[in-house]
From Swiss-Prot:
Recorded GO MF terms: manganese ion binding; RNA binding; RNA-DNA hybrid ribonuclease activity
Organism: Bdellovibrio bacteriovorus (strain ATCC 15356 / DSM 50701 / NCIMB 9529 / HD100)
Keyword annotations from UniProtKB, A to Z: Cytoplasm, Endonuclease, Hydrolase, Manganese, Metal-binding, Nuclease
Coiled coil residues, start to end: none
InterPro entries: RNase_HII, RNase_HII/HIII, RNase_HII/HIII_dom, RNaseH-like_sf, RNaseH_sf
A GO CC annotation given for this chain: ribonuclease H2 complex
Name of the featured protein: Ribonuclease HII
Binding of a divalent metal cation, residues: D42, E43, D133
EC supergroup of this enzyme: hydrolase
Gene of this entry: rnhB
PANTHER family: RIBONUCLEASE H2 SUBUNIT A, RIBONUCLEASE HII
Chain ranges of the RNase H type-2 domain: 36-221
Length: 221
């Protein structure tokens, strides 16, 4: 790390510090994939200490929301709720999940892929091209072509739509768990590893909604 005095000296001598380059992820024309239908898939909740992992799969029936959706993490809660309702109304959506018990049994990566598989199966279609956010294809998904797209939730509208639906659906569940287990604040942090959440585990121990294989939880089982 350069001290401020050194940086100031370099600037005085006309030496410019290189700026950290921002990596751009261009939009992808998802309609160019085949065969139809094109299915966007994403999951939410992988990094949480509590609650299931959720996934959604979306087939666009029109371009009505193509330019409105983006990664769910970049939207306000109110806007996510509005868009999720529109997506569910206007498009074909499948929602899947993997339980806390499944996460602890098969690990979070495999549970996330299982949730995505279940979401695709809920669509009621037997073939198509699945665009998966990330770099892992969905195992044992028969009858479908698959492509993985890094940062797909920013680059592919159906994946963005899936991320929105998955997050809103999971957030609603975590709010319900917050009522059922009031010591943990699930309705606020949605199960993520915040200082308040971690301290509540120290103070009260894990509840049935916690992932007992995760660091930050297993130490208090």
């Amino acid at each position: 790390m350069l001290f401020p005095s050194i940086i100031a000296g370099l600037k005085h001598r006309g030496i410019r510090m290189a700026k950290k380059e921002k990596i751009e992820f261009p939009k992808i024309e998802w309609r160019d994939f085949s065969p139809a239908p094109i299915i966007g898939v994403d999951e939410v909740g992988r990094g949480c200490l509590a609650g299931p992992v959720y996934a959604a799969a979306v087939i666009f029936k029109s371009d009505a929301l193509n330019d409105l959706v983006t990664d769910s993490k970049l939207l306000s809660e109110k806007r996510r709720e509005e868009l999720a309702d529109l997506i569910l109304k206007e498009h074909i959506v499948g929602i899947g999940s993997a339980s806390v018990e499944e996460i602890d049994e098969i690990n979070i990566l495999n549970a996330s892929l299982l949730a995505m598989k279940r979401a695709v199966e809920k669509l009621g279609v037997k073939s198509g091209h699945v665009l998966v956010d990330g770099n892992k294809k969905i195992p044992n998904l028969k009858g479908f072509e698959q492509s993985t797209i890094v940062k797909g939730d920013l680059r592919v509208a159906p994946i963005s739509a899936a991320s929105i639906v998955a997050k809103v659906t999971r957030d609603r569940l975590m709010k319900d768990l917050g009522v059922k287990y009031p010591h943990y604040g699930f309705e606020i942090h949605k199960g993520y590893s915040t200082p308040v959440h971690k301290q509540s585990i120290v103070d009260h121990g894990p509840c049935i909604a916690h992932r007992r294989s995760f660091a930050g939880v297993k130490e208090y089982v």
